[in-house]
Amino acid sequence: MKTNPLPATPSVWGGSTVELPPTTRDTAGQGLLRRVLRPPISRRDGPVLPRGSGPRRAASTLWLLGLDGTDAPPGALTPNDDTEQALDKILRGTMRGGAALIGSPRHHLTRQVILTDLCQPNADRAGTLLLALRHPADLPHLAHQRAPPGRQTERLGEAWGQLMEATALGSGRAESGCTRAGLVSFNFLVAACAASYDARDAADAVRAHVTANYRGTRVGARLDRFSECLRAMVHTHVFPHEVMRFFGGLVSWVTQDELASVTAVCAGPQEAAHTGHPGRPRSAVILPACAFVDLDAELGLGGPGAAFLYLVLTYRQRRDQELCCVYVIKSQLPPRGLEPALERLFGRLRITNTIHGTEDMTPPAPNRNPDFPLAGLAANPQTPRCSAGQVTNPQFADRLYRWQPDLRGRPTARTCTYAAFAELGMMPEDSPRCLHRTERFGAVTVPVVILEGVVWCPGEWRACA
């Protein structure tokens, strides 16, 4: 009788499973196959651990958050480390991290010692904008370089000389070597340009504040002569934005006689710096209402969200009617999209400068190469020619026709410049707070705008033409 060998796989007999042991031959074959397929350097008994270390364990949630003790290894849980203790540790760590973040925001301070001719911090308040002014001795040289032919370049030097004669020390010329006023208060600049604003009553209030609260008997003369300096700068194309820059938001100051040491926030949150005044330890940005423009409200743009702040200077270049005006504009538009909005807002100035910006300039000589003679050169076979690849070779390029037009009296980008803007910073809140109110400066009431939560991040000037 022939019998079949027992199977090496599990069999089902009577509803139960019976696993038969493998034979010695099968075991020997599996060992040989395992030695062939697995290299000698492979791990045989789990992961290879360094000497003296235990097996790998899962990291706990507290250890991953950095809230567990430094001496407790990851995954080491105690019976008392229940859910309530875990939540308590997480909340305490979050509060410590939040307090450290809120208590020490990053901001940068700058300090300068100045004369109090164009900036008197005692009369202004913390949060006032300060602008740095280039050395006045450089301006006459810039006028000779940039003024169009026919313009009176000496007008700028004379205007600054008359302004320096009305300063506190009586002279501020470069040859005297005395201290000069290197900072200009935004309020003083607005007061000097008071005649240029549409809100004339609010601008006159700023001028009355500067005249009444700035120390000295010749404050009105300084305002008039500084205004003449601004008009002379526009006349000679040494535009004010080329000699002024943002210095910072005023925080604290120390004055003695006609000198002042001012401290300002030049970058970062304005309200992060302590003013040292017990009544007002923090300062918000304060601006004259006549010099503040909410561009989104004017043009019907935007909605809730963060906004940018820009410092804008506008110019009118008509003969004997030169004007300069300064604004702080709030808008959600980024710098690359602001110029079209300014063109719409100050379109009248742009048209005026384009039409009348060349007045008082020496006109070109009549019939002196007015147009490039392209048709005549193309029709004459004797005219020297060269290929595009030979233009850079002087042997061929020197024989070509030279067109030398007379550009005197012709419109340029500088004659059409009507504005310039620079980014000051931003208001990162979803709903930036701009408070319109009246503040009392001594005996004068001035309409102002208070901006809260301003973060300074100044940028470069961009001219609009």
From Swiss-Prot:
Q: Which UniProt keywords apply?
A: Capsid protein, Host nucleus, Virion
**Could you cite one Gene Ontology molecular function of this protein?**
DNA binding
Pfam families linked:
Herpes_VP19C
Q: Which domain of life is it from?
A: Viruses
Compartmental location: Virion; Host nucleus
Coarsely, its chief localization is virion
InterPro entries referenced in this protein's UniProt entry, alphabetically: Herpes_1
An annotated GO cellular component: host cell nucleus
Q: Which GO terms describe its biological process?
A: viral capsid assembly
How it assembles, according to the record, is:
Interacts with TRX2, MCP and capsid vertex component 2/CVC2.
**Primary role:** Structural component of the T=16 icosahedral capsid. The capsid is composed of pentamers and hexamers of major capsid protein/MCP, which are linked together by heterotrimers called triplexes. These triplexes are formed by a single molecule of triplex protein 1/TRX1 and two copies of triplex protein 2/TRX2. Additionally, TRX1 is required for efficient transport of TRX2 to the nucleus, which is the site of capsid assembly.
What family is this protein classified in?
A: Belongs to the herpesviridae TRX1 protein family.
- Tell me the protein's name: Triplex capsid protein 1
Q: What is the lineage of its organism?
A: Viruses, Duplodnaviria, Heunggongvirae, Peploviricota, Herviviricetes
